[in-house]
Amino acid sequence: MKEIPTPRELSELEIKDVINEFRLAARSAIEAGADGVEIHGANGYLIQQFLSENSNHRQDAYGGTIEGRSRFAIEVAKAVVDEIGAERTGIRFSPQGTLQGIDEGENSLEMYRYLISELNKLTLAYLHLMHFGNEQFLKDVRQLWDQSLLVNRPGRSLDQLSSDVDNNLADVVTVGTWVLANPDFVERIQSGAPLNEPDKNTLYAAGKEGYTDYPFLK
């Protein structure tokens, strides 16, 4: 078995380099023809690691307090906005999500209220939330955020997909796994056709299985 090194704390200079890499990646996406980019601050990846108490043990300006743990996400967003424009930039979070062993701590929703308020000042194109059921928090975000709000509720049944839009809790509802399993998802929904069931065993596997082999309607 290959030995996995223990992660170490980035220096502040290295943090600046990583922020610059986000900026360069955004520029590259636009030059390649993308309409915009979504900054991935969810699912246990680097931005959420800065936000989370059990992975961010820093004692400098990027750790400790709510403001400190939020700083990296805000600086990444500012760098991307400066490079490609706010109208081309969205950001995604998964408040209280625990993927990859993440634990954001007891004050996580207070932290997100602060973070979202600060990001709102940048007038990003949208905020994309994975929502895990704290309805008051979602209502609070709706008040804090002035631009488009996208909401994904993992595991929500198809007949409930539109409820957040219907109840003015979101502008857009996003779908993940169902779309992976149904390359013609929109057509199936419009026509009432049955959906392919996602194969969870292949979601993170290599090869075409679960990637390009789901059947079309015709």
Tell me the role of every PLM-derived stretch.
Residues 1-218:
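Flavin-dependent oxidoreductase catalytic cores
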